[in-house]
Amino acid sequence: MTYNFDEIIDRRHTNALNTDGFRGYIFHAGPEKVFPYKDEEFVRMWVADMEFGVAPEILDALRGRIDRRIFGYTGLYDDEYYNAFSKWCRDHYDWDFPREQLCVTPGIIPALYQLTETLCTKDEKVLVNTPAYGYFVHAAEYAGVGVLTSPLRKKADGTFEPDFEDFERKCADPACKLVFWCNPQNPTGRMWTEEELRKAAAIMEKYNLWVVSDEIHCDLIRCGRRHIPMAKVMTDYPKLITCMAPSKTFNLAGLAFSNIIIRDKTLRGRFRDRDKLFGMVNPMSLTAAKAAYERGGAWHEALKAYLDGNFAFVKEFFARELPEAVMYIPEATYLAWVDLGKCLPEDTDLPDFFANKAGVLLEGGNGLFVGNAAGYIRLNLAMPRSIIGTGLKRMAEAIRREQAK
């Protein structure tokens, strides 16, 4: 089957966060905030969901479930979903896990909040690498616990690596209880090597820390690469929790369905006991997730190839039009992490600048990515290439106008 990733789909007026909720999320404002551009004129390169239609194989499964006509209380009462997901894990990562370790939640973010509350007391802290996914810190703040940060080290080519000396110092803090490990890393797009994973694992095990490995981007990798779950490295470590989901890979975020794999039996029981949905799931979410893992393989491979082309397109654009910008093709994610430190004044509010001066919605800076992110923007490239081209052209023109002042 041929898949059309160049199709432009109108998402307005669907209550999509991407189109209808950006004021509150990016700018912490309501409808009173106005821009020189109409909402429909923005190029939206911000929140991490895709502008591509869902795989036809998944849509067919959803239509089939609709035809059953009843949408009563639903749970995972048979092994069909586990079998589909665990086979995907074996095929793609050469790894799987026992059925009893699988918990499902409406999302990884709710799981982060719940795990932090369950594992940490008020005098304890969580540790994150920076730049970081903001909800790692929000989960800690919600639970009333402290945050330790270990900045990733920037290399000469613009990519990042862990600073293991600093990471161990932070892990050794007596208050450190929990590490949020992002694998692949958001926003830098690093796929940690096996050596890096083993070094991090040895440190976390040495200090007997709980580890939440957020692996939601693990299937959004460059063609020819293979994800290494932290669980393949920490093979017997009982305090590891692995978080995966079909949502990012198959553009199903609104269906709110994620996999939380908890090894420790006691924690697993506490996690399930605190489940506000009592083990219930949305029947359409379950149908879509199962179909994704069973039938979505061909679409997934085509998606990766298209994303690789998008990254090459963006890399070439910056090299030609904005050579002072530092952009590398990441090993994973559909997110470009671009250093504009030499393009604009360091105190520039980048999301506000590009919204007002270019009509482009994006995220960036320390306010959204915790720290170690000044001068950086994160660009979502999971969209038709023609839209990316329009957005980049607007951004380059806005930067040139600003530089000419």
Regions found by a protein language model. Name each.
Residues 233-308, 315-317:
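Conserved core segment of the aminotransferase class I/II
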Residues 353-362, 368-405:
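PLP-dependent enzyme catalytic core of the Aspartate aminotransferase-like
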Residues 98-99, 329-334, 374:
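Short Gly/Ser/Thr- and Asp/Glu-enriched loop/turn motifs at secondary-structure junctions
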Residues 2-5, 9-107, 114, 292-295, ...:
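N-terminal small-domain helix-loop-helix segment of the aminotransferase-like
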Residues 70-202, 219-237, 241, 403:
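Conserved core of the PLP fold type I
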Residues 143, 206-207, 358, 402:
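Helix C-cap/helix->beta junction micro-motif
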Residues 290, 307-315, 327-340:
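Conserved glycine-rich beta-strand-loop-beta hairpin in the small C-terminal domain of fold type I
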